[in-house]
A protein has these predicted regions:
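Core catalytic alpha/beta fold that binds nucleotide/phospho-ligands
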Residues: 1-120
């Protein structure tokens, strides 16, 4: 079993959404954008999903240091999020025989966090 954890300030994601219009398209799939944009506070949802992507990357051992496309990790579903891998991330997961991925996300007023557990 491998675990990845991430914590991010919601204000940081809110600023990225406001300052960099391409941030949404570069980091989130169409389904993720539709979900987040439908929420009362989209920045909280985007921050949770961003933290989720980071946590999954860390649990898979690819973290921030190895290049991958953010959209290669897609987080969908509610209330229990599910993770769909594609592209390079999927290839790396298959090479390492990664099992099922469980993900938990949460947020407070200021922070979003995620914990990913990858089975062996």
């Amino acid at each position: 079993m491998r675990v990845g954890v991430d914590l991010i300030e919601i204000a940081r994601i809110r600023r990225a959404l406001e300052r960099y219009p391409r941030f949404r398209e570069r980091c989130f799939t169409e389904a993720e954008r539709a979900y987040c944009d439908s929420r009362p506070n989209p920045a909280e949802s985007y921050a949770g999903r961003f933290a989720g992507k980071e946590a999954v990357g860390k649990a898979l051992g690819i973290g921030v240091a190895r290049a991958f496309a953010w959209k290669d990790i897609e987080i969908v579903g509610r209330p229990k999020p599910s993770v769909h891998l594609s592209g390079r991330v999927r290839e790396l997961a298959e090479k390492t025989n990664a099992g099922a991925i469980d993900l938990s996300m949460s947020h407070s007023r200021e922070l979003a966090n995620a914990v990913a557990v990858v089975g062996d």
